[in-house]
């Protein structure tokens, strides 16, 4: 995948959050260096997803794979390190925003266009998504029919890692003071998320 400014910025952001958490947990300094080196190697192999709305999630997937290849810890422990590092970052909280901004009706037109574009499947590893209309049960609904993180994990020979990144959505929703309800994930064998 191309190392665009966006990809490099997101990579640096995740790395700084995880690096700080590794330090808090007493890891050796070379662990963070090994993670970023491995992450760069994975991103160089990763299939292009263009200017996807979910490029930060794709980069997160690569970074998590790199952690699992570099720390000597279990996927669960690496998930906790990643989660705690992000939650401790004030910048992350600021960037995520809140429920009001995320659910703004002004964003619906862009979401619908994104959904339509995703169905063209221009990039093999990008997500394919349907936006669900507001109803009595929820303010915003998504059906992800294809998942870029699952595809990246499959390409890297570690499909079992995708499920840990699915859990990160609950962390993000909590940070934004939203409630996330999920009926299944592709990573766990469901037809869609």
Where are these regions (language model features)?
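Short, hydrophobic/π-rich interface segment
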Residues: 130-188
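A short beta-strand signature within small-molecule sensing/ligand-binding domains used
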Residues: 192
């Amino acid at each position: 995948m191309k190392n665009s400014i966006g990809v490099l910025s997101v990579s640096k952001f995740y790395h700084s959050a995880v690096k700080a958490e590794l330090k808090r947990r007493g890891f050796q300094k070379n662990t963070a260096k090994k993670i970023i080196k491995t992450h760069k190697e994975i991103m160089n192999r990763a299939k292009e997803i263009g200017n996807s709305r979910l490029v930060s999630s794709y980069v997160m997937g690569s970074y998590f794979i790199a952690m699992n290849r570099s720390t000597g810890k279990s996927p669960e422990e690496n998930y906790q390190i990643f989660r705690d590092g992000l939650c401790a970052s004030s910048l992350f909280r600021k960037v995520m925003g809140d429920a009001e901004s995320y659910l703004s009706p002004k964003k619906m037109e862009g979401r619908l266009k994104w959904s339509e574009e995703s169905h063209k499947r221009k990039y093999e590893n990008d997500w394919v998504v349907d936006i669900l209309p507001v109803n009595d049960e929820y303010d915003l609904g998504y059906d992800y029919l294809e998942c870029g993180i699952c595809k990246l994990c499959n390409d890297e020979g570690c499909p079992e890692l995708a499920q840990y990144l699915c859990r990160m959505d609950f962390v993000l929703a909590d940070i934004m003071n939203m409630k996330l309800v999920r009926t299944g994930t592709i990573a766990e064998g469901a037809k869609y998320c």
